[in-house]
Amino acid sequence: MGRVLACHGSIDRFSEGEPIRALGIFLFAGQLGTLLEQTGWVARVVLLMLLAFSLFSWALIFQKSRMFSRMNHQTALFLRIFRSNKFLPEPKQMGSGGSPLEPVYSAGYREVDSQLRAGNPHGKVTSLNAVTVSMQLAAAEEVRRAEKYMPWLATTGSVTPFIGLFGTVWGVMDAFTGLGAAGAASLRAVAPGIAEALITTAAGLFTAVPAVIAYNHFLHNIKDLGSRMDGFTLEVAAMIEKLYPGQRM
């Protein structure tokens, strides 16, 4: 019975602590709002700039995450279909248009088809190098498409800390100005300037850190994509070598 009462008491203490924590969060939010109201126009401009950088960066992060997730799924499906065929299937039969391997394969298939239709008497692929180059060009285009807007993340990660640092310096200058106007050292005189400095510093870091992490993660995905397309190009070239043996340039 005593153990039950002890458990009951701990539950009561836990339930009583929840409103206290909620009240603490509410008070912190209220204090943050008060600090923002006390900031000057320079700090507000800095915060608005950082907010714009942050919003666009997060939108780009979500868009890139969905894009790479879809690419990985469609690429796995595309490779499974391709490897299940003993001959070169037509691109429209692959049924996986969301994979970056699809335009790479289509470029190689068109080059093979054009060589077979060129009227050579033996119906052979005369230049395997031309097929490989056409696929490599298509792969380079897909890499460029995957790299779209990546410089924005790099710029956000490198520039926003300095924007926040500018707000920090301005806030410290404002604090010294308030201290000089008050004529005596007091917390009330320096609080607005210190608040500006701390808020802009935190905002700059909050904007820069996710952008840098996302940039490095997506850069790794792009390098992996390039490696997979290079490997797929060699795989297609090897299949063409088996299907159309003979003298080539």
Where are the model-predicted features located?
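Short, strongly hydrophobic alpha-helical membrane anchors
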Residues: 2-39, 186
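Transmembrane alpha-helix/interfacial motif
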Residues: 39-91
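Residue-level signature of catalytic and energy-coupling elements of molecular machines
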Residues: 40, 58, 91, 105, ...
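N-terminal membrane-entry
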Residues: 44-47, 147-154, 196, 200
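Residue-level signal for the membrane-embedded core of alpha-helical transmembrane segments
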Residues: 46-49, 53-56, 160-163, 167-170, ...
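Predominantly long cytosolic amphipathic alpha-helical stalk/bundle segments
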Residues: 71-166, 172-186, 213-249
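Hydrophobic alpha-helical transmembrane segments and adjacent short intramembrane/lumenal linkers
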Residues: 183, 188-197
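Hydrophobic alpha-helical transmembrane segments of polytopic membrane proteins
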Residues: 197-211
